[in-house]
């Protein structure tokens, strides 16, 4: 049986743990946007058939999640020993005589008898129920002082192995996708996208990194402190980048993005990697006036004064199959919209978040509110009546009928089209309108109104809601 440890001699189930440096090896990470990290380490440590015990450097280890992907190896126990603090060193020094450095370089020696309650024996044989004042000096012994966390792992191998393959789930590293779209007047946009990794726990040196996009349930809170993981998480040798952009694959109900080349990042130092080459996409712009009805609940009477309504600006990027942008699934993230001014400088004109978008599905985002397109809505009529003879099993049946006038003003020199939408859960309908409504779904209808440049347009409609 082979053993290696930095802690000294240990006995466990008849296995001797002999002193040696912790084993290192290749590291790869799968980073999830919620902060979880799957850490995989292939360690240059041979396993003999049967029981093996080793000391490993496993940064951010949650022992409960440790396992071996090798079908011939099982983890039978794992003990995480954090970096040594002063109290732990004092406990390990019980029975030892330590030197305590006091003010102006003075020293005093005392034997540690107990830490809680504190008891020390002085050189004259007297016992003191406290520690001597000053800072204790400890011998630099591996069995006494650990400068970083280490894990003592017991493995059962059904056959000898040349390396040790381990994996576990940690936390403290997140990633987000941010996209930039430079929109032009011709209806075409140039789109780029990148992933930014932020670490509050791991310092990674030359590791293979994958980013995972998808909705993964979380049922368990990691118990060990993230601070214990603030050490190097990888020792793989540097290699030339495989490609300039991430490659993508489907695993279960997630999409996994392999970043090119070995990746290194430090705590608190964000790293950005491109997700795909620059792509061109056609787009359309929409102006949308949201409806007056609540999604659920009572449609109330409004003031007779006109009510200013924000006009939302939406962009839809076409992502047909067979196009460079359409064949690529997009991890959910933030889309930043830019447009060039008269001098050719790009200006930020909108920003929106969106969810994971599969290949072939158009991307629709709301960039903000219009500046030169405005809307006012006024309630011109309102009636509420009780409907006799309600259906069996229902209480009082109320019908609300309300009429509205929406005035659209376009300060742009060119003509535009504005959507006025209404959506509501339940039994409702449009009984009269100055423009034909279009039914988008069982709960939403819209009016499409052309508005001339530097001009106005008016819509009137009546809604009937039964509740």
Give residue ranges: language-model regions.
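Long, intrinsically disordered, low-complexity accessory segments associated with secretion
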Residues: 3-5, 11-467
